[in-house]
Amino acid sequence: MGIGVLIIGDSGTGKSTSLRNFERGEIGILNVAGKPLPFRNDLARLDNARYNQIHQALMKDSLNAYVIDDAGYLLSFDNFRRAKENGYGKFVDMAQSFEQMLEAIAGTSADTIVYVMMHAERDADGRIKPKLIGKMLDEKLCVEGLFSIVLIARNIDGRYVFETQTDGLTPAKSPIGMFAEREIDNDLKAVDTAIREYWNLKPLGGESDG
């Protein structure tokens, strides 16, 4: 069973930039919006990835690290594509497609980590949560509750960090002792190393057993 890591943050908080220290062959980038990465790199990526392509990549499971950047756009693009449809059924379908993607993540090998990046939004009480479309996903399926690790991307006075434990207004969480501090540098490769060391997973870049 693969490990999903949810990364939530506003635009400009360094979510994509956190990939900067990965080397080619270490991670598969499923680039939903097709945007260029914000740093020089030769990382292999699949631009304009949609659900079927994401499922195919995860089923192949040829790497032991993937990132879906930004998973929220899967919902947005699906909603635009079906804009002329009325009724609750559209949102049921959208919720099912998203949930099936999460199942595909869980279906990868035990040494595979899949990072799911999403934009943030705030509820009426100011609490941060992943930005979703439709009440079914928002109310019936607590997306952040399906992940054992949730990181919040922040820009604090020009310092880009991941929050690893909640401050009371975020769903940030991680296992006890996995990270030395509540706020860490937004280096996703260092995060990957910490997760693998904590749970004794195969090192980054090794072939998956999937």
Regions found by a protein language model. Give the residues of each.
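Conserved P-loop
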Residues: 1-61, 65-68, 72-73
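Structured loop/turn residues at beta-strand edges in well-structured enzyme cores
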Residues: 61, 110, 145
